[in-house]
Curated annotation (Swiss-Prot):
GO cellular component, one term: host cell nucleus
The family this protein is said to belong to: Belongs to the papillomaviridae L1 protein family.
Biased composition (Low complexity): 478-497
Subunit (UniProt): Self-assembles into homopentamers. The capsid has an icosahedral symmetry and consists of 72 capsomers, with each capsomer being a pentamer of L1. Interacts with the minor capsid protein L2; this interaction is necessary for viral genome encapsidation. Interacts with protein E2; this interaction enhances E2-dependent replication and transcription activation.
UniProt name for this protein: Major capsid protein L1
Record function comment: Forms an icosahedral capsid with a T=7 symmetry and a 50 nm diameter. The capsid is composed of 72 pentamers linked to each other by disulfide bonds and associated with L2 proteins. Binds to heparan sulfate proteoglycans on cell surface of basal layer keratinocytes to provide initial virion attachment. This binding mediates a conformational change in the virus capsid that facilitates efficient infection. The virion enters the host cell via endocytosis. During virus trafficking, L1 protein dissociates from the viral DNA and the genomic DNA is released to the host nucleus.
Endpoints of the signal sequence: none
GO-annotated molecular function: structural molecule activity
Keywords, in A-Z order: Capsid protein, Disulfide bond, Host nucleus, Host-virus interaction, Late protein, T=7 icosahedral capsid protein, Viral attachment to host cell, Viral penetration into host cytoplasm, Virion, Virus endocytosis by host, Virus entry into host cell
Region (Disordered): 468-503
One GO BP: virion attachment to host cell
Subcellular localization: Virion; Host nucleus
Amino acid sequence: MAMWRPSDNKVYLPPTPVSKVVATDTYVKRTSIFYHAGSSRLLAVGHPYYSVSKSGTKTNIPKVSAYQYRVFRVRLPDPNKFGLPDPSFYNPDQERLVWACVGLEVGRGQPLGAGLSGHPLFNRLDDTEVSNLAGNNVIEDSRDNISVDCKQTQLCIVGCAPALGEHWTKGAVCKSTPGNTGDCPPLALVNTPIEDGDMVDTGFGAMDFKLLQESKAEVPLDIVQSTCKYPDYLKMSADAYGDSMWFYLRREQLFARHYFNRAGNVGEAIPTDLYWKGGNGRDPPPSSVYVATPSGSMITSEAQLFNKPYWLQRAQGHNNGICWGNQVFVTVVDTTRSTNMTINAAKSTLTKYDAREINQYLRHVEEYELQFVFQLCKITLTAEVMAYLHNMNNTLLDDWNIGLSPPVATSLEDKYRYIKSTAITCQREQPPAEKQDPLAKYKFWEVNLQDSFSADLDQFPLGRKFLMQLGPRPPRPKASVSASKRRAAPTSSSSSPAKRKKR
């Protein structure tokens, strides 16, 4: 007899619904008011490989390299406290104003050039490209003076939050599997904000060289005790709000120039089933830890990303260029202007060339200029919008002087009558805590544009380019010479347009 049985398959319940993230264009209303803001010439001078401390403790000369991130934190004025020409176009009781970035140009000075980086004691054993004999005679110290032209990178990331970087560092060892001294440490991928002065990937990997390379001889001097970070494009693109990256520009190129192997013991030996044992000094085989020195190849002005305007029509995330917190973060890398200037000074008056009497120095210079076009926008303070903004960033409503009512207390509270009496516990109210900058512990290049806004767009290069994008505009009416001078009445000899048509 046939019998019905319920299905043995598992029943999958739908996931718990989550709050939907909406684009800023759904609750931000854009106006027809635009402003231009630009920085002054931004300069940096320092040593390209390391910082120099002449007094022993204080850094006299900072490290300034073309392979460093330049992270500009651009401060904008509060539009709700801004002197507007016509403040009647919005209601401050029901609306708030915000800035939207619609145009940007990063200007770069200085000529194109390739700067070298290297190490006078670089760990290279053999030239594995043209080696004539594979030997295993490893001496105590085979380091050599090697210089390279590193990977070529042009990068620009724009957002209202710091860009996020990723790198590999030493991970934690499980207690159940303790390691021995000299074992390869476990690796862990970590995310940290990209700060001004952090090193970019130069072709040797995004990793913490200070923790993962104890020999101090595997990479050039400028990164041997540093951490090279690479922008985490995947995580920033997947960000729910898209504040850290509205858009980005990227161009990278390199090729392998020289091929070496490393001196030292091979910690993980080659399995014996991968080769036949040989003689004449080939057993055991030489080091199989290979490394290639990178080269950024040719630098040309035809492949430049800077010194040209970019217009933001649609961001890659939900934040379409709205400057929350009245700030913009611009993360820049440009290694096409990496020339290191050689400067020398004689220790005494020279009568002939003597290298022993000449001190040699290295300096690298950076030159930037930032220009923006901002659009004034309005947000209507409805209950739904305020609740959404509070969940997104709870400091926004505080900055707008909008407070949330605390819940009504359901328990019985104590209230003393004589609050100044010394017979009871101190009833003095604690002063409100000062507002702390959540990004104060990070290093950025501060650029203050609070006094640099101008509505006369045609007076600035980027403003004129922006007006050209809008199309031709009607000419301004000419001012009359005299207010009392009236237009002359038509004479009998002059014919009206209607009469001309009849003729």
